Amino acid sequence: MAEFVRAQIFGTTFEITSRYSDLQPVGMGAFGLVCSARDQLTNQNVAVKKLMKPFSTPVLAKRTYRELKLFKHLRHENVISLSDIFISPLEDIYFVTELLGTDLHRLLTSRPLEKQFIQYFLYQIMRGLKYVHSAGVVHRDLKPSNILVNENCDLKICDFGLARIQDPQMTAYVSTRYYRAPEIMLTWQKYDVEVDIWSAGCIFAEMLEGKPLFPGKDHVNQFSIITELLGTPPDDVINTIASENTLRFVKSLPKRERQPLRNKFKNADDSAIDLLERMLVFDPKKRITATEALAHDYLAPYHDPTDEPVAEEKFDWSFNDADLPVDTWKIMMYSEILDYHNVEGVPQMEDQQFPPQ
């Protein structure tokens, strides 16, 4: 039985195994507190995330289960990886991941990025997205603070808490506004992996310019700012809007022509402008894919088609529509944790049918 030690962080009790020491708070989110710590087994610095009340409601229990399943499935150099998971005596769940020194948001607010760093960071983002999308996963909340970077400029995408299946009827109000694709704002209905490409385009533009490209104050202002640069959406995009109110709003906007991105990004080279043009397209189906972006001239210095892997298999989303009680999610979660630690002789849930028969 592991020995647990307690520490108070921001008024929150961290109850972790004695394997980890030197807890220091590094971030607070809606669903958990993250601390840095020293892994005394590997002598490496790690990030320890405490999930707040993971079994308080069926919705939170499912979210916790989904996050763990994604952690276990997504194994790629440009995606954050799980190094340990445990349940404390108080039944809190802790995820332990590698610790990277900073994130893209902090880098962008501290100094301008040189061209070779912009290229290398964008290459790694696209390399990670190629893999994630091939697994049938949409991140949905890609933004600079979710892109971690270490001192060697290695980049990893993190925080798949909002990630969901590729689903033509996907719904929700999800990513941070500045980086949110127009199809999320306009329809709240149909979107897919292309939303991540839009977000990556906004991040690319921010790396080039040093400030957010579309800093909207609210949804209406956000969309207006986008149309000032990219023009009015084409009719075939407008016709996909499901909400009558949204449709009226879009049709009430003054007609605008798309502005040449060259006018805004005067110091960027032509290949950067061309790639950005292909990422920031209103019609999701005409947006460049991660695989296509990797082969673009702008990323040629780093492109290696033999070292840009895809997922071996699609992520299994069959649990996602299941409406189960907390205790069932908890049993399934415990089973996944034991499986992660290769504990033999535990009841497995692989044969669980969703929804249960």
Swiss-Prot record:
It catalyses: L-seryl-[protein] + ATP = O-phospho-L-seryl-[protein] + ADP + H(+); L-threonyl-[protein] + ATP = O-phospho-L-threonyl-[protein] + ADP + H(+). The keyword rRNA processing does not apply. The modification Phosphothreonine is found at T171. The modification Phosphotyrosine is found at Y173. GO terms for molecular function: ATP binding; MAP kinase activity; protein serine kinase activity. GO terms for biological process: stress-activated MAPK cascade. Its EC number is 2.7.11.24. SUPFAM superfamilies: Protein kinase-like (PK-like). Its cofactor is Mg(2+). A motif (TXY) lies at residues 171-173. The active site is at D141. Residues 20-299 form the Protein kinase domain. It is found in: Cytoplasm; Nucleus. Coiled coil: none annotated. It is an enzyme of class 2 (transferase). Pfam families: Pkinase. It comes from the Eukaryota. Belongs to the protein kinase superfamily. Ser/Thr protein kinase family. MAP kinase subfamily. HOG1 sub-subfamily. Proline-directed serine/threonine-protein kinase involved in a signal transduction pathway that is activated by changes in the osmolarity of the extracellular environment. Controls osmotic regulation of transcription of target genes. This is Mitogen-activated protein kinase hog1.
